[in-house]
């Protein structure tokens, strides 16, 4: 092959690569906003509120546990000289993301309360580029506040984000939103409004896939350092930084006897104060809604009153917090009724060696690792049309390469669902052939 031919091939290849990159850039940045009404679409509003509010603020930082569990209007009644900013978003995005996005806009006089959900992912440097692109759609300026170590994840997820936007534009419809997990569920403070969420809807009163441990190995050592360094930078600006335990469903805790030792460990390792009694974070199941960290409306009120008391204690204010607390909601679970049930690994054993497993519509929860021993499994077919009626955890597909097939017209709902979205890349539409 002569040099001229080689140069032509190289030039053609470079032109194709350049054209591809330009195509992605046009789709990602040039097409209209598509994810603005989704759950992640709320982050830009929280970001703008944090940037624009002046004076002293109480800034609540964490995952969706913060968004669900705090009543900012009630806090406003007791701390009227402060603006309240709820900067809790989504554990699936990563705690680091909200810490990084908030850092440049914390200023002197602020009280910052870091309250991640208790778990290995939230206590690590985990960062999800896919969710970050969805959150930034239409507000790409906030990406400048991300740290350089996350640029690779952002670049790697950009083509998928761009193609998703193009797909929605071509179909003439934006991503479907379901139940409470959408932007319009948030109020101006950044809290999720829970007026219709007053009871525990979990099959056993807690999420069996979300066991909670209070042990030292839950916290990534590097992330402990990251929290301390972050707090120091905020304190240098004149802010006060506290850590507070996120509310946890008591039924989900593996060993409550571990809490005391864990609290000692946390207070020794963190260079900023831990406020409140950790025992108060363990709340009875009746106060929760749909996860082991999401409170229902009555639970939210109870937790917020306790948060106010914790803060007043730190500020040296010994005046009583007199608020009429709501009654505990009635218990909505017991023995799992015959018409609804949880799918376990034992259920999957009967399909050993088969390529397809069909999950009936009456299954309300699928346990983690339920398909890990199903050699040869290719398809998991769900008959449930509404993804919010079947809860799954983070390890649903561990040990299997199977794809998830859902009813027609439900694909987008599953891909955008709070619980199922982590498996979006492996969710497709069921066909008549697959159903057989």
Q: Language model features by range: what are they?
A:
Residues 61, 65-146:
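Membrane-embedded segments
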């Amino acid at each position: 092959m002569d040099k001229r031919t080689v140069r032509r091939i190289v030039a053609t290849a470079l032109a194709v690569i350049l054209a591809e990159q330009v195509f992605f850039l046009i789709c990602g940045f040039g097409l209209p906003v598509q994810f603005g009404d989704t759950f992640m679409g709320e982050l830009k509003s929280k970001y703008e509120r944090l940037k624009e509010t002046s004076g002293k603020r109480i800034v609540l930082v964490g995952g969706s546990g913060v968004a669900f569990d705090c009543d900012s209007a009630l806090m406003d009644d007791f701390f009227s000289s402060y603006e309240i900013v709820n900067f809790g978003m989504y554990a699936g995005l990563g705690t680091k993301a909200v810490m990084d996005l908030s850092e440049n806009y914390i200023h002197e006089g602020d009280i910052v309360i870091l309250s991640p959900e208790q778990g290995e992912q939230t206590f690590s440097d985990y960062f999800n580029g896919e969710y970050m692109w969805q959150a930034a759609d239409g507000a790409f300026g906030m990406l400048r506040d991300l740290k350089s170590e996350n640029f690779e994840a952002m670049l790697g997820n950009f083509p998928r984000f761009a193609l998703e936007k193009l797909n929605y534009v071509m179909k003439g419809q934006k991503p479907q939103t379901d139940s409470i997990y959408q932007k319009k569920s948030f109020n101006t403070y950044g809290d999720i409004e829970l007026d219709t969420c007053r009871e525990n809807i979990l099959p056993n009163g807690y999420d069996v896939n979300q066991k909670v441990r209070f042990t030292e190995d839950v916290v990534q050592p590097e992330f402990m350092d990251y929290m301390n360094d972050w707090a120091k930078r905020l304190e240098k600006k004149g802010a006060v930084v506290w850590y507070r335990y996120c509310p946890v469903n008591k039924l989900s805790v593996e060993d409550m006897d571990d809490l005391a030792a864990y609290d000692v460990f946390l207070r020794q390792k963190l260079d900023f104060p831990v406020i409140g009694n950790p025992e108060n974070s363990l709340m009875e199941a009746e106060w929760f809604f749909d996860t082991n960290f999401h409170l229902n409306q009555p639970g939210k009120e109870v937790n917020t009153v306790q948060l106010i008391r914790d803060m007043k204690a730190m500020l040296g204010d010994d005046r009583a917090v007199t608020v009429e607390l709501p009654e505990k909601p009635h218990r909505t679970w017991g023995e799992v009724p015959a018409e609804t049930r949880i799918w376990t690994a034992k259920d999957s054993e009967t399909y050993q060696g088969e390529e397809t497993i069909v999950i009936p519509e009456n299954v309300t929860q699928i346990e983690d690792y339920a398909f890990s021993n199903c050699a040869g499994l290719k398809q998991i077919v769900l008959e449930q049309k509404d993804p919010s009626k079947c809860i799954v955890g983070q390890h649903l597909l561990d040990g299997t390469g199977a794809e998830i097939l859902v009813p027609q017209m439900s694909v987008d709902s599953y891909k955008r669902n709070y619980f199922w979205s982590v498996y979006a890349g492996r969710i497709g539409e069921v066909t008549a052939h697959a159903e057989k």
